[in-house]
Amino acid sequence: MEKRIANIIYSSRWLMFPVYIGLAFGFVLLTVKFFQQIICVIPEILTMSESGLVLIVLSLIDIALVGGLLVMVMFSGYENFIAKMETTENKKRLSWMGTMDVNSIKNKVASSIVAISSVHLLRLFMDADKISDNKIMWCVVIHLTFVLSAFGMAYIDKMSKKHYS
């Protein structure tokens, strides 16, 4: 009976599979939004202000960072919780695949969130004259919370590795 329960619990990891498929679909949607922004800016490029162009580029960077975060979570999550990804050619396999444990994934996700928040904050600062001081203050507070959380998680990870080494 105990072995059967263990097998059921172990097999339940496959319930994560639709979640990763959903993330892949989210990545497709991000890609569509990325190209939509590029297509929309093309007719206006010659009349657009430099700061307007910088805001568009920051938006594209933001989408790229979120996309990278999605890919990292999909690939490493699949490999950590479901099964090893087999590619047709080993040379196509990304070098970091199979090397990230849950703690390193958490640290990379936290770093990515800080980077995404930084880009968002920079976009706000570029339009600071149109945004209330209160909103900017709260965005800075939230960003600092992300930064402190990332440092805290990295510190805890470092201490736990030192303690268990």
UniProtKB/Swiss-Prot annotation:
It comes from Buchnera aphidicola subsp. Thelaxes suberi. This is UPF0114 protein in repA1-repA2 intergenic region. The chain crosses the membrane at residues 15-35, 53-73, 136-156. It is found in: Cell membrane. The keyword Transmembrane applies. Its main location: membrane. It is a multi-pass membrane protein. Keywords: Cell membrane, Membrane, Plasmid, Transmembrane, Transmembrane helix. Pfam families: UPF0114.
